A protein has these predicted regions:
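A structural signal for multi-pass alpha-helical bundles of membrane permease subunits
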Residues: 1-253
Length: 253
């Protein structure tokens, strides 16, 4: 399972002249950091764009998904079950189908080749998932906690902000991580909606090294290594919260 990671690291340290050796070296005999120097020289703007889009997606997703999940879990509006079904179906729509629909809409709105356009597009994937996670988690919050807040005079908004959100840390971390990783690794929306713009994320920046007659594989793999680090670090740091957030609501007392 870890072989692709090992091979990615191996190729990122292999000199260009050794790329076509047959059989290939299992370890780089003459390691070089040329690929990583290329990343620092060429890819930092793309990494910055990916970070901006990822954080923007997280913020927009939380702003929309947390209140919606609270409403479905605690306020139980009319048609809430149907809305949950719609959100589930939305998760099944292929990304390329949504990208083609977004292209026409964004063309009319002037959102093509913009970072905020990609934030909106990526959020359409993260928000339905976030609503389902928040709904499941907030359904498990003891009703006595909500009732106590109401007795103390808190309205619906105050209860949500001061009581429900503070105890929903696991769900917030889970949804934030999913939204960030989706936006960070997205290629379909980026290539369709921002293929020729100045705000290209790292998933498109890697193509800087690929041409008809030239493939700088050590730079490509070095870029992949650097781009994988934020995702790996976040997963390691947040795995405890993710496990709790995903399983919340699955087991009832």
């Amino acid at each position: 399972m870890l072989f692709p990671v090992y091979w990615m690291l191996n190729v990122s340290l292999t000199p260009q002249q050794d790329m076509r050796k047959s059989p290939p070296d299992l370890l780089p005999l003459h390691p070089t950091f040329e690929g990583y120097r290329a990343v620092l020289n060429d890819q930092l703007p793309y990494l910055g764009t990916s970070l901006l889009i990822g954080l923007g997606t997280v913020v927009l997703t939380l702003l929309l998904a947390a209140p919606a999940g609270f409403a479905l879990a605690r306020l139980r509006p009319y048609g809430g079950g149907l809305l949950g079904l719609v959100l589930l179906i939305a998760q099944m729509i292929p990304g390329i189908v949504m990208a083609m629909g977004f292209y026409g809409i964004f063309l009319d709105l002037g959102l093509l080749n913009s970072w905020w356009g990609l934030i909106i597009a990526d959020s359409t994937i993260a928000v339905p998932f976030g609503v389902m996670i928040f709904t499941a988690f907030m359904s498990g919050i003891p009703g006595e906690l909500i009732a106590a807040a109401r007795i103390d005079g808190a309205g619906t908004l105050r209860t949500f902000l001061s009581v429900v959100l503070p105890v929903s840390r696991n769900a917030i971390v889970t949804v934030s991580l999913f939204g960030f990783l989706w936006a960070w690794s997205d290629f379909v929306f980026a290539n369709t909606l921002d293929g020729g713009g100045d705000w290209r994320p790292i998933t498109l920046g890697i193509y800087h090294y690929i041409g008809n007659n030239n493939q700088e594989w050590n730079a490509i793999m070095a870029t992949a290594v650097v781009a994988s680090l934020p995702a790996a670090i976040l997963l390691v740091l947040a795995q405890r919260y993710v496990a709790a957030g995903v399983t919340a609501g699955a087991v009832k007392d």
